[in-house]
């Protein structure tokens, strides 16, 4: 719709990755008469699953829960390769008629809310031409993930300028890289490092996993035998639902046990690692963190591949800090010399909310850190804005699907009331000191100043619990603690334009 000089859509979705495509599918199915567009800053869809190209990039959640609830995952592997996930996302977009709604090379950089018109005025930079344009929308929905695409977190190391080898950050993996015959050091202890190390060890001369402190890891097969059994004996859509709920129950049980009886989970994880590694391997030094399970995300080892490569002597684990770099490699704080041809800095991500978009409310800058999150989806005092942020203790898409259902319910409630704005109300009383994302990972703690706060009770508190959220988002009334309003001027939406 053209409103004078600017196009207007009912819902503007920012991001065409896993969350954004899912959000658009929900809009298409649940609000078929609503107009919408998807802005994507890159030239292709897929988000994370197109950006990351390092060897054996994969999910660290099973695809029966990382997949959309409305689009069954039918491939054989439960823990899928990145290329298969990307194909699944794009095929879903085609199946639901979403692909044509994506505006590529369009980065939303600024969104200005007007209470007079009940609209967001969004400034877009065309990343292919550096031109700017404007689009207006009734509802703005961020599906941008949680990290910067153009820059990963990369600490500076003493003496790194002396190193004569190659530095690589996994977020920007060089095309055609050949590990054959190379001595490779991977710095980091997160999911990326745990995936990369065994993948590189297949061809490299030697791979060293250099971590400042250990992470909890668990081995898991990439094939789910129960899922395969059900897929062969039930109609596929029914089997997918059963498997999905099975895995939701299983992951919730493990998480709750980790929080309530951490010593039990610690011991079980340790026992499994001791059994998988050679006698004499220092499991306590290299795989026994000081924190409790799920204070940081648990890392998945598919088919025990990391343990296998350690057992073969192709991977060495060093738990120590870096003292300095030399021409030929690294010297640790304990004086160990690690020679390297290539250093991979799997040191994390740089968190970014709403893709770095600036928000302005009636002419005043809006800092989300000054506001309280509502159901982890909307922001108190900020009208007609939603954000998709998945679970940190389970598959991202479980929360993304619930978020999409809830946003559609809110939009329907607005229509029933004849409202043009909806604003969550702030809680009475004190706020929680707990951050919006309750993990102690470095990339989260570094970005605390960007994130909304939590309240002390629902709907302003995040519980990271699918069953509680299912009740809150899908079964409970959609309008609790929401203020609905109407624009003071009538919208002129008479001219339809192509997108």
Task: Give the positions of each predicted feature.
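Short hydrophobic core segments
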Residues: 14, 134-147, 184-187, 330, ...
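C-terminal active-site-capping segments
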Residues: 401, 405-499
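Beta1-alpha1 glycine-rich phosphate/pyrophosphate-binding loop at the start
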Residues: 9, 13, 18-102, 211-212, ...
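Rossmann-like dinucleotide-binding core of oxidoreductases
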Residues: 5-8, 12-13, 18, 22-23, ...
């Amino acid at each position: 719709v053209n409103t004078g000089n600017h196009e207007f859509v009912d819902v503007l979705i920012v991001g065409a990755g896993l969350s954004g495509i899912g959000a658009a599918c929900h809009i298409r199915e649940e609000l078929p008469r609503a107009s919408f567009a998807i802005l994507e800053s890159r030239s292709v869809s897929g988000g994370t699953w197109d950006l990351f190209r390092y060897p054996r990039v994969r999910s660290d959640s099973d695809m029966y829960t990382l997949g959309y609830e409305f689009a069954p995952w039918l491939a054989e592997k439960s823990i899928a390769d990145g290329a298969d996930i990307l194909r699944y996302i794009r095929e879903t977009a085609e199946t639901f008629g979403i692909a044509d709604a994506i505006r590529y090379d369009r980065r939303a950089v600024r969104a200005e809310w007007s209470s007079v018109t009940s609209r967001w005025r969004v400034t877009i930079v065309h990343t292919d031409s550096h031109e700017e344009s404007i689009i207006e929308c009734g509802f703005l929905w961020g599906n941008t993930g949680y990290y910067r695409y153009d820059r990963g977190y990369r600490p500076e190391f003493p003496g790194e300028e002396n190193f004569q080898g190659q530095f690589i950050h996994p977020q920007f993996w060089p095309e055609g890289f050949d590990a054959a015959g190379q001595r490779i050091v991977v710095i980091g202890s997160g999911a990326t490092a745990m995936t990369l190390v065994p993948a590189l060890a297949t061809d490299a001369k030697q791979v060293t996993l250099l971590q400042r402190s250990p992470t909890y890891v668990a081995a898991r097969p990439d094939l789910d035998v129960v899922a395969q059994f059900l897929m062969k004996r039930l109609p596929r859509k029914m089997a997918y639902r059963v498997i999905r709920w099975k895995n939701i129950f299983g992951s919730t049980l493990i998480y709750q046990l980790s929080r309530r009886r951490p010593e039990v989970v610690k011991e079980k994880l340790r026992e499994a690692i001791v059994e998988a590694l050679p006698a004499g391997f220092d499991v306590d030094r290299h795989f026994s963190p000081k924190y409790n399970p799920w204070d940081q995300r648990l890392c998945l080892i598919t088919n025990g591949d990391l343990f296998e490569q350690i057992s073969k002597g192709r991977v060495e684990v060093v738990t120590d800090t870096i003292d300095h770099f030399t021409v030929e490699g690294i010297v640790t704080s304990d004086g160990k010399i690690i020679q390297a041809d290539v250093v991979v800095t799997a040191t994390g991500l740089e968190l970014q909310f709403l893709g770095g978009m600036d928000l302005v409310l009636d002419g005043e800058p809006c800092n989300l850190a000054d506001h309280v999150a509502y159901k982890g989806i909307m922001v108190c005092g900020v009208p007609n804005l939603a954000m998709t942020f998945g679970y940190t203790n389970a598959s991202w898409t479980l929360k993304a699907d619930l978020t999409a259902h809830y946003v559609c319910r809110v939009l329907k409630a607005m229509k029933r009331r004849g409202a043009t704005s909806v604003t969550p109300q702030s809680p009475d009383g004190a706020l929680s000191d707990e951050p919006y994302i309750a993990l102690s990972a470095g990339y989260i703690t570094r970005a605390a100043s960007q994130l909304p706060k939590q309240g002390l009770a629902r709907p302003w508190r995040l519980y990271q619990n699918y069953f509680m959220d299912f009740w809150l988002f899908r079964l409970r009334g959609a309008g609790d603690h929401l203020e609905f309003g109407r624009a003071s001027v009538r919208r002129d939406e008479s001219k339809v334009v192509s997108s």
